Amino acid sequence: MVVNVDIDFANLYIGAVSCLNLKTLSEDIFITCNQPTKVRKVRWNGTENQLTILLINQRGDFPSMSDDFLRFLPLMRENCYICAEVIQIHVVMIDTQLNEYMMEMLRKTPTEFHRYLYQNIPWEAQLVGITGARGIGKSTMIRQYILGNQDKGRFLYVSADHTYFADHRLSDLADEFVKDGGTHLFIDEVHKYSDWSRELKQIYDVHSDLHVVFTGSSILDIEDGAADLSRRALVYPMSGLSFREYLKLFHKVDSPTYSLEEILAGKGEVTGIEHPLPYFREYLRKGYYPFSGEIGFEMRLQQVVSRTIESDIAQHANLKASTARKLKKMLAIIASLAPYKPSMEKLAVEIGVSKNNVPEYLTYMEKTGLIGQLRDDTGGLRGLGKVEKVYIDNPNLMYALSGSSVDIGNVRETFFYNQMKARNDVISSKESDFVIGKNTFEIGGRKKGRKQIEGIAGGIIVKDDIEYAHGNVIPLWHFGLNY
């Protein structure tokens, strides 16, 4: 039900509200109060003797608490009667820019395809973080959840780089959102808000019934902040599209996920396409990113690389512009030689930095999704072994950085490592290419022999250019069905 009310602030007059028996209505009532320069929205929630006034002007920001309004508020308390009961007035300062931004972003969100991580996120937990490289679909995934679950509460989606936060605090927004009945707050690109981890901690401690989900592309900043939230936040890393997801998104070919054990047993298959290899070739070139189907994919991917280095890494590590350019050069060198067997001294000389800084720069690039570092198992703990090889993170990046000069053998290894490390601990092999659990993997083309795995228990030959598994020979594309 909508009721229009004219409010003359000059005369501080209000009418039409007191004659409504709001308590007899089960639906929300929206009372819109129009003036030439302002729009006022008044909402009664239908369950309590409480009238909520949203003060919004046409610029989309808030009018100040002027003398007129301060005089108007007591008058509202005095004159708004429902069934001889005085309505409590509660002023909620929620900026319409944020609601309009959310509605516009939701309108643009595709809903036909969900990423692998969607079903694994405990969306109703109090504080959840989703991390991953730029452009892999984190924002789309959380907006899809909003679109599919609006019956579960009241949602607000914001991006931390919105101009609203230039002079508003995140914690204040959460306070007002909860007062207005908000239940789920989604904060995109949270690392772009300074002091985000402290304020999320405050929100967590103060609003135990508010569900907060945040995303971040700058994994470096997220990891630093997550240390402060270690006992509060559940943080989930997200990868780019698997080959299975690529087939679903771009070719409408559905396939289940297969565990590594099922793949090694030769059970991996895709129904709906007779010959998967042409699709696999396409995926290697431009299938890892959800924006692969857009015009100008290569240019956008180059922009992802530039922004990752110049913004995420440089700002996190407080690097000069000249040092950021050296990191770009380092990435180009790795791309031309990948899998790169690291020589810190040679790499330092090549790009003109101290040898002591090279491992740190490599770690920055690894954590922002530009490279992968394959380690041995000498560290005893995951991720602490000696770095044996450095890979570009995924084949799409290899082609974007190296073009036609890319080596297909390197592409194959990069694909295997990229797809397997999403759900498995992958370490280097002294005899072959990779070790996962009790299995040793040798990667190659159709003519790849068994020499490297002779006498090795659990040895697996992974071949490109074949469609079917036989014995311990598994098609390379099968490993793209793991998530």
Per-segment meaning from a language model:
Residues 141:
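Hydrophobic positions on the alpha1 helix immediately C-terminal to the Walker A/P-loop
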Residues 81-119:
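N-terminal pre-Walker A segment at the start of P-loop NTPase domains
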Residues 416, 420, 434-449:
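Conserved catalytic cores of phosphodiester-cleaving nucleases, focusing on short active-site segments
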Residues 138:
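Conserved lysine of the Walker
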Residues 94, 217, 223-327, 331:
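Interdomain motor-coupling "hinge/lid" segment immediately C-terminal to the ATP-binding subdomain
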Residues 153-181:
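Short glycine-rich substrate-engagement loop in P-loop NTPases that contacts/grips substrate
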Residues 130:
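Hydrophobic anchor at the beta1->P-loop junction of P-loop NTPases
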Residues 293-430:
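Accessory nucleic acid-recognition modules appended to NTPase machines
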